[in-house]
Amino acid sequence: ALFADPDISFYNRKGELYPLSLIDSDRTKKHTFVKAPTGAGKTDFLIKRCRGRIFYTLPFQASINAMYERILHDLGDHVEDIRLLHSISQLLIGEERITEKVIQDKFGASIKVLTPHQLASIAFGIRGYESVLFDLQGCDIILDEIHTYSDIMQAIVLKMIEVLNHVGCRIHVGTATIPSALEKEILEILGKEQVQYVQLSDEVLTLFNRHEIYKAEAFTDLLPVLQQAVEQEKKILIVCNRVANAQVIFERIEELYPKTKKMLIHSRFKRGDRNRLEKELKNEYNVSPYACIVVATQVVEVSLDISFDLMITETAPIDALIQRFGRINRKRTAETIGKYKPIYIIAPPQKDSDCLPYNPEVLRDSFKVLPDGGELLRETELQSLINQVYPKTEKLDIDLDAVFVDGKWRLKELWHLSKSALIEKLDIDSVVCITQEDDESGKYREADKEERILMEIPVRYSSLRWKKLKQLDVGSHPFVVPDIAYSSERGLDLAKTGAENYDTNYQIW
């Protein structure tokens, strides 16, 4: 049934280990703001607050996949129309023209799980935004993990909140951590008196302390720690900020521990391989009684429900680090409360250019404010650490492009901005590639849309721009990379993607 409200009574369940489940939904308040650590029952609480059709937004592909599975598992028998929206803006970049295909499907579903980029059209009046708004008005919009967005995306999310509020949506914001300045702005837009504001008491927060922090100058300093952890059959997670670093470290691990179960996971895999790796990570590594090592990038920060014993990580912005730490000692049971596990943080690089994709100053400040020497990271102090690193939110002015300014729509009805300002703002220059084999064998051309998606490797256009690669005119217009540049264990190696590495032995028809 289109436009049917879902039956979400399942989420009224209560459990002592999930303090948020013990708090009742205040029906007199239209909106919600929940600030609580991972594992406190945030998802259940946000859904419990909904009264109509639900749009559940999360920042990353991996997280929307995981959330979709979870809701399907929880509500499968009660709700017939739960939909997953993959990246809606399939950008076709060719002849320097950027076109945006807004996929207007899955209209009127009871529950949709998606990324906020897919709703951003309403802040910018990109083609198709009227029907998106029509679908959204009067619904419940959950904006979860809101702390993980970049500055620009935060500005866009604020604008979206303003528009959604204007069209009668109930807005439910969930976050583990958030700079106070940003929280204040959100509450101002929604109107404090309209918001059920929920955070845990210091007493309860103390039960969420789970990590002891150690600092190190370089990865090599931690090799003895790694050795000991492997001997003790620990599950080890190593997190890097860049794919190339992760690939280098994975090679070291392969040399050092040829017999230990290990995996590399990052964004530059064929989507089919990435899905397989995510499943293995959850179903095999996560439950392994023996030593295993997973080397990853930011893809593990959010919503991959894994719980390891020890982490070695490069310094990231403090809010992202707190997310990362959530993958260690995550499972809360009566036994694990009060038991702590170690996290080792590697100092940020000296050179600013090596700090990319992050701001060097933010990295240095984040490293500085964290404890050291095995000291406990206290949940009650996280807010002050974050405020030290981000004393104020930098306001980005997106009103120039926005369609909705000061409570008024700026566009004439059904007229849209011809070129999406959003793409330039978000610097979404994501394109896909496929391997030479998937091209030459005709596999990609003959495949249907779903099969094609599984062959595609997402990359940034800027990293392929000068490589003179062949580009197909079908599907997502993928670039073709040499077979030698890809392996199902390591993903895409950008250093080998030049056209000079094409295999010329494929039969020329």
Question: Model-predicted segments: where are they?
Answer:
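Walker A/P-loop
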Residues: T28-R49
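Interdomain hinge/linker at the junction between the two RecA-like core domains of SF2 helicases
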Residues: S180-V230
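C-terminal helicase lobe and adjacent C-terminal extensions/tails of nucleic-acid helicase motors
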Residues: E183, E231, V248-N283, T313-W509
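Post-DEXD/H (motif II) to motif III coupling segment of the RecA-like Helicase ATP-binding lobe
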Residues: S131-D140, I146-D202
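Conserved helicase motor
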Residues: L84-E95, V243-A244, M263-E278, T297-E301
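Conserved strand-helix element at the start of the C-terminal RecA-like helicase core
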Residues: R53-I64, A229-E254, L264
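Inter-Walker segment of RecA-like/P-loop motor cores
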Residues: V79-G125
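Conserved Walker A/P-loop ATP-binding site and its immediately adjacent core
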Residues: R51-D74, H86-S89, S180-E183
